[in-house]
Curated annotation (Swiss-Prot):
The keyword Protease does not apply. It comes from Mycoplasma mobile (strain ATCC 43663 / 163K / NCTC 11711) (Mesomycoplasma mobile). GO terms for biological process: regulation of DNA-templated transcription. This is Probable transcriptional regulatory protein MMOB1910. Transmembrane segments: none annotated. It comes from the Bacteria.
Length: 244
């Protein structure tokens, strides 16, 4: 994708957060709660899944008090956390858009029913549950706004030296791509080398290999549809190949 498209996607996500901050934090709290209640325990230093969830929350500017509350809630509540199940659905929309929806739900029937209704409303088709379309690759993503670093060349060198797969530099930010298996290791090394604290994005994502473009009117309709689906309490993440 072009740099503008990547940055537009970041701004789109941040705008959605500003408009419904409490819902975003609720989803992040649920993710932290489930990770902390698992076999890895409530210590991010010894629980990779929890550490990833906390890094993601911090990148979304979730207050420290909210994170600590979710961690505290997890203590002794593993039974409640076990009721949450991950559900992955992929589907296609008219015009060639591919959508990947990841849910974390304590009610599978409700989640499935809502996802099916959303795709039906826009004329889309759902694929098999649990399948990841071939156009998506699972990658670690670190987005760093330009004001957070002084020299893009130094950032690139430090990131590649830390084990990053790729570094993409754009007008307003840089994107560091990693293998999911060494995401936290790369992030820790970059943090130490450049004294970085703030990220626009710090999480594992499904990135599309190709994108599709739409005319403005259709694009606005798709954006509204995605935002409505994001508001669903069971939906944690939505990935797509639309060039916004």
């Amino acid at each position: 994708m072009a740099g503008h498209s990547k940055w537009a996607n970041i701004k789109h996500r941040k705008g959605a957060q500003d408009a419904a901050r409490s819902k975003i934090f609720m989803k992040l709290s649920k993710e932290i709660f489930v990770a902390a209640s698992g076999p890895g325990g409530a210590d991010p230093e010894t629980n990779p899944s929890l550490r990833l969830a906390v890094s993601k929350a911090k990148a979304q500017s979730m207050p420290k008090a909210n994170i600590e509350k979710a961690l505290s809630k997890a203590s002794g509540n593993s039974k409640n956390a076990s009721e949450f199940k991950e559900l992955i659905y992929s589907g296609s929309l008219p015009g060639g858009a591919i959508i990947l929806v990841i849910c974390l739900t304590d009610n599978l029937n409700r989640a499935i029913s809502n996802i099916k209704a959303a795709f039906s409303k826009i004329g889309g088709q759902l694929g098999k549950s649990g399948s990841i379309p071939y156009i998506f690759e699972r990658k670690g993503v670190l987005d760093i706004l330009k004001e957070e670093y002084e020299n893009s060349d130094q950032l690139m060198l430090e990131a590649l030296d830390a084990g990053a797969e790729d570094v993409q530099t754009f007008e307003d930010f840089s994107r560091i791509i990693t293998n999911p298996s060494n995401f936290q290791e790369v992030k820790d090394k970059i943090d130490k080398a450049l004294s970085l604290e703030n990220y626009a994005t710090a999480e594992i994502q499904y990135l599309p290999n190709t994108t599709v473009s739409f005319e403005k009117e259709k694009l606005e309709k798709l954006e509204t549809w995605i935002e409505t689906l994001e508001d669903n309490e069971d939906v944690q993440e939505i990935y797509h190949n639309i060039d916004f």
